[in-house]
A protein has these predicted regions:
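Catalytic zinc-binding patch centered on the HExxH motif and its immediate surroundings
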Residues: 4-32, 40-41
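Active-site-adjacent bridging/hinge elements
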Residues: 21-32, 58-70, 112-122
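Short pre-active-site segment immediately N-terminal to the catalytic Zn-binding motif
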Residues: 31-51, 80-84
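Solvent-exposed, polar/charged alpha-helical surfaces in well-ordered, non-transmembrane soluble domains
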Residues: 48, 90-94, 140-145
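Catalytic glutamate of the conserved HExxH
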Residues: 49, 53-61, 90
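Post-HExxH zinc-binding segment in Zn-dependent metallohydrolases
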Residues: 62-117
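Pan-zinc metallopeptidase signature
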Residues: 119-176
Length: 176
């Protein structure tokens, strides 16, 4: 790649805009969901984003994700980041799916009609999609197996590994 650090950063910011409907920051503990100016009520799609991000907030409270991230940052070693984020996203997707799965036909149609058509303004290199594939496609497959074999408690146990056993016991992306 022949991009400067600033160009890579700009691409990363654009990727975040293209790919994310909301976010929860592990460090500042702020949940962000973009809404329209003067919007008074969240639609069902936006509510589903809040459900997903609230799971991340709970993960932060229970699994010490801020300390986990700060320790990796201090060590300048993010070996365990992709594996744990895959499990975190899988758990949030699972809970969000349970919530949206409770919709009746009317709410499901309403929800589907409210999903925004998000497009990127730039062409992104294919390697930008590798972590997203792990977090949002491979992680949920693993989480379904964990939940099938040990319910949500088993997935929580996997996420508690940092709190209970330390950084170097966490799964890497290769293990996921």
């Amino acid at each position: 790649n022949n991009l400067s650090p600033d160009e890579l950063l700009n691409l990363q910011v654009e990727f975040q805009r293209c790919f994310s409907a909301g976010s929860y920051n592990l460090l500042d503990k702020i949940l962000r969901v973009p809404i329209k100016k003067n919007q008074k009520k969240l639609n069902l799609y936006e509510q589903s984003v809040v459900v997903h991000e609230l799971v991340h907030s709970l993960q932060g409270q229970h699994f010490a994700t801020d300390k986990w991230y700060e320790e990796m940052d201090e060590l300048d070693d993010f070996t365990y980041y992709p594996g744990v984020v895959a499990l975190m996203e899988a758990q949030a997707d699972y809970v969000e799916g349970k919530w949206t799965g409770s919709f009746d036909e009317y709410d499901r149609q309403t929800f589907n009609s409210q999903i925004p058509n998000i497009t990127c303004r730039v062409s992104l290199p294919s390697y930008f999609y590798i972590p997203a594939e792990l977090y949002y496609n491979i992680g949920p497959v693993l989480a379904k197996e964990i939940i099938k074999n040990g319910k949500m408690e088993a997935l929580n146990d996997a996420l508690y590994r940092y709190v209970n056993d330390g950084l170097n016991t966490l799964p890497t992306s290769e293990q996921i």
